[in-house]
Each structure stands twice: as structure tokens, then as C-alpha cells.
Amino acid sequence: MSAKAQNPMRDLKIEKLVLNISVGESGDRLTRASKVLEQLSGQTPVQSKARYTVRTFGIRRNEKIAVHVTVRGPKAEEILERGLKVKEYQLRDRNFSATGNFGFGIDEHIDLGIKYDPSIGIFGMDFYVVMNRPGARVTRRKRCKGTVGNSHKTTKEDTVSWFKQKYDADVLDK
């Protein structure tokens, strides 16, 4: 045993992957975007409402303007792999947050391997990945809540190094 044993509690893992398509209007385009997310994830997406009225964009408060779906487990890793393949395994440094999460967007959903359907059209989407370590549940549970120490919290540097090592990817500076 020449190498020091790695603590399994320090391993980073993907907690969830959130796929979001923001259409900007309710109606037919929103239902078509919903079909795209359902094809991709195999789950029924949720519609998101506008927080406030923006007259210049023609958006009213509480109008449904986007759809999103949360994917966990091996399915999340598989969809993330497809999304990173579209981005050619390159992300920018500013795609990573200080808390260790990261996100990116793609322009066309058909790049993910979904067959083009003229009745649906083409939609871009955002990928948001939430990272954590084992033991993060103690801050979220209802009974006997606890805190996670600073050394165990997920940081940007941890996630960037995990991302480079797991996907053999590049993180561009600017």
C-alpha cells in the first residue's frame, strides 16, 4: 500500500440534473417543448410560471413560459454524457459556480440524438448539474438537522478537477 487510501465520503457525485427549455410564451410551443423533454428523459416535465410581468417581452405574471425536468441516478449521467458530447467536452470556467455546481446550454436538441420531427421543431435547452458528497442529506432532512463542515462542502475547484478527471474534458479560462 504505497498510495494513501481515498476516503469514500470525499467522492463527488451527481445529485441531480435539471433540463430546462425556456420558451418565453405559453401555448403550442410550450407543449412541443414539453414533448422534447419527455422524449429525452422519459419523465413528465413540469411547467414553470413567470415570476413577474415583463411588458416588452409580452409576458404576464404566472403565465407558463418554460418546462423543466429533474433527472437523478444513472439516467442523469447518461443524459449529461450526451450533452457534453455536443459541447465537445469543453466548458468555460464561468460555467462552474462557487458551490460546485455547473451548467451549460445547447442550441439544438437534435444534436443529442433525438430524431427531428417537423411537427415539434427545434429547441435549445439548458443543463444544470448539482454536485454533492455523501452526507449532504444532514443539512436537508427534517429531523435532527445538522451542518456540513467547510472542508466537506463542495467547491468550484473540487468540481472542476472531478469534471476533468471523469470526462477527460477541458475547462477553458475565458
From Swiss-Prot:
The modification N-acetylserine is found at S2. One of its GO terms (molecular function) is RNA binding. GO terms for cellular component: cytosol; cytosolic large ribosomal subunit; nucleus. This is Large ribosomal subunit protein uL5A. Its main location: cytoplasm. The modification N6,N6,N6-trimethyllysine is found at K75. The lineage of its organism: Eukaryota, Fungi, Dikarya, Ascomycota, Saccharomycotina. It comes from Saccharomyces cerevisiae (strain ATCC 204508 / S288c). Component of the large ribosomal subunit (LSU). Mature yeast ribosomes consist of a small (40S) and a large (60S) subunit. The 40S small subunit contains 1 molecule of ribosomal RNA (18S rRNA) and 33 different proteins (encoded by 57 genes). The large 60S subunit contains 3 rRNA molecules (25S, 5.8S and 5S rRNA) and 46 different proteins (encoded by 81 genes). Component of a hexameric 5S RNP precursor complex, composed of 5S RNA, RRS1, RPF2, RPL5, RPL11A/RPL11B and SYO1; this complex acts as a precursor for ribosome assembly. N-terminally acetylated by acetyltransferase NatA. It is found in: Cytoplasm; Nucleus.
